């Protein structure tokens, strides 16, 4: 019964993630880790290398502990139950030791994570068996671990044995993630320790307006700039409910702008807009900043939002649709036509040439910006760049129309700049998990 319930819950989670264009290639189950005795294998490894030892004195007597390089607070550890109960705070020496196995033999949170981290790098000496969980999942077949060799299926990709491991866990788990790096180093795996990345992020809260719209009493957080989502307080937001609310609002806006669209098309476009609203909002802030989610801000067609970027891409697409109708020019024929177009507009020393080249050069920065985001683990630089690029295009098109430009050669060069911009913005949106609808 427990396995059935877990399976159904996971499938609903996957369906929700699929609404936001998020897919996975492997599901790992904690039960398989336990049944395959990953921890027992890792514990033997830790004992043999001396990375952990049994404390024989003080409040931690009988516990297997690991020496740690720096102190952490209970709040940082995120798991105060890891330490044995005590009436008094431990002394300085004990604060430099982290409990891995309690005196009653139970394994702490960080102990289990050590075994899992070793598996991720292919250092554990043990592996799961694998079976297909969903053959037609988003992006290809979705695999699942299994502890039963009889359930294993052939053809699984090579999971584990990673060169780099990036654990996406909120900032309150920073201390425990540091301990994982220290454990790898203590075992002699210095390279793997340096290649263990904690991609931390701050919490996501709600604006007061959004919390009220979702039906929550915000009086207890009246003196704070946001409403903290808390399971303990019973204040939570279901992702599907939020997406539904965003999609309903987006559908109303799309219908207002495109009264002739069938309901099915409106619904499909609204889902695309809702997804972009959430995904862009989640990456436009730096990782160290609390994200205060506001429905109206996320859905704005005119502010720094996913829908604004989508609209800027749709606008460029519409230009090419009308170019085809009026002048018989599409993106493929444009390249050939440019070969005979006079380059005067490109070579002129005037504001128009400066602005055209400015749009092209700004579009060309995408690869460098993405590289910066990877190096710094700060995806907000991509979001900020995409927003700036969309603004640059809107400013350019306002000053220099393409469709109504009477000079054919100038029209071609402007169209070429728009084509390059469109390709780069569409790629930037795709990197953030956002697609471009046909209308908005």
Task: Give names to the regions the model predicted.
Residues 1-440:
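Non-catalytic interaction-recognition regions
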């Amino acid at each position: 019964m427990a396995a059935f319930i877990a399976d159904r819950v996971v499938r609903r989670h996957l369906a929700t993630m699929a609404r936001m264009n998020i897919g996975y290639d492997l599901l790992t189950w904690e039960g398989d880790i336990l049944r395959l005795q990953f921890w027992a294998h890792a514990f033997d490894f830790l004992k043999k290398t001396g990375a952990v030892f049994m404390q024989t004195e003080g409040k931690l007597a009988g516990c297997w502990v690991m020496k740690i390089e720096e102190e952490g607070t209970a709040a940082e550890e995120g798991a105060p139950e890891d330490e044995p109960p005590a009436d008094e705070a431990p002394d300085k020496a004990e604060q430099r030791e982290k409990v891995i196995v309690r005196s009653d033999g139970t394994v702490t949170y960080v102990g289990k994570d050590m075994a899992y981290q070793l598996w991720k790098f292919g250092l554990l000496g043990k592996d799961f068996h694998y079976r297909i969980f969903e053959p037609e999942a988003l992006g290809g077949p979705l695999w699942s671990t299994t502890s039963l060799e009889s359930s294993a299926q052939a053809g699984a990709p090579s999971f584990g044995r990673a060169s780099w491991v990036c654990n996406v866990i909120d900032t309150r788990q920073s201390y425990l993630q540091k301990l994982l790096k220290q454990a790898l180093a203590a075992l002699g795996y210095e390279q793997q320790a340096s290649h263990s990345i904690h991609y931390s992020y701050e919490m996501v809260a709600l604006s007061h307006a959004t919390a009220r719209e979702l039906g929550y009493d915000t009086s207890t957080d009246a003196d704070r700039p946001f409403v903290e989502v808390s399971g303990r307080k019973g204040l939570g937001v279901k992702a599907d409910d939020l997406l539904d609310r965003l999609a309903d609002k987006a559908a109303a806006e799309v219908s207002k702008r495109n009264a002739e669209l069938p309901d099915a098309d409106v619904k499909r476009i609204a889902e695309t807009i809702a997804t972009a609203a959430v995904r862009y909002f989640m990456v436009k802030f730096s990782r160290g900043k609390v994200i205060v989610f506001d429905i109206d801000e996320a859905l704005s067609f005119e502010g720094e939002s996913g829908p604004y970027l989508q609209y800027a891409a749709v606008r460029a697409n519409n230009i090419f649709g009308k170019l085809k109708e009026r002048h018989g020019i599409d993106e493929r024929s444009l390249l050939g036509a440019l070969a005979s177009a006079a380059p005067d507009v490109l070579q002129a020393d005037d504001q128009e040439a400066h602005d055209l080249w400015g749009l092209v050069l700004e579009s060309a920065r995408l690869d460098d910006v993405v590289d910066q985001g990877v190096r710094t683990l700060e995806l907000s630089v991509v979001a900020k760049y995409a927003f700036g690029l969309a603004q640059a295009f809107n400013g350019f098109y306002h000053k220099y129309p393409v469709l109504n430009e009477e000079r054919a050669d100038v029209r071609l060069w402007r169209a070429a700049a728009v084509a390059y911009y469109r390709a780069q913005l569409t790629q930037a949106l795709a990197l953030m998990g956002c697609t471009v609808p046909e209308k908005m």
